[in-house]
């Protein structure tokens, strides 16, 4: 792989990238879901103590977290408790791995946005990769008006 941090520092210093765009090859697809301690509908923080915690794993899966059973989640700091990342040979494979991971992940004692991520993974535009900066606003609009 490439050292992206090194490349970002080079660009910030006004230097060119150490490789050309033509030298880049796409090798699969990756996704990341940020798991937050918040209500999946209202986005209100959900502080408390994690009573039970299980993180997923397996090929093409990475989880970065500080969370564990007995961990106290404060209302005074960032609500992110984990990042779940998946990689697959294709977008459908990466999405399938992410779905499996989110379904396997257990966080009891607080609410999380895992149900929201699962709904996003099912959305036809997300599945097809038809995304833009307005996706979430459109995705959440039916809830704001009392719909789906």
Regions found by a protein language model. Give the residues of each.
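ATP-dependent carboxylate activation and anion-phosphoryl transfer catalytic cores
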Residues: 1-148
């Amino acid at each position: 792989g490439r050292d992206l941090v090194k490349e970002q520092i080079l660009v910030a210093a006004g230097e060119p990238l150490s490789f050309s765009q033509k030298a880049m090859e796409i090798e699969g697809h990756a996704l990341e879901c940020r798991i937050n301690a918040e209500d999946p509908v209202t986005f209100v923080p959900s502080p408390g103590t994690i009573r039970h915690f299980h993180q997923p794993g397996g090929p093409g899966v990475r989880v970065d977290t500080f969370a564990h059973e007995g961990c106290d989640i404060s209302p005074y700091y960032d609500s992110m408790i984990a990042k779940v990342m998946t990689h697959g040979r294709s977008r459908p494979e990466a999405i399938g791995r992410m779905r499996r991971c989110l379904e396997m992940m257990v966080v009891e004692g607080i609410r999380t946005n895992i149900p929201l991520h699962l709904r996003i993974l099912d959305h036809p535009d997300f599945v097809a990769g038809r995304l833009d900066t307005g996706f979430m606003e459109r995705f959440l609009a039916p809830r704001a008006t009392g719909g789906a």
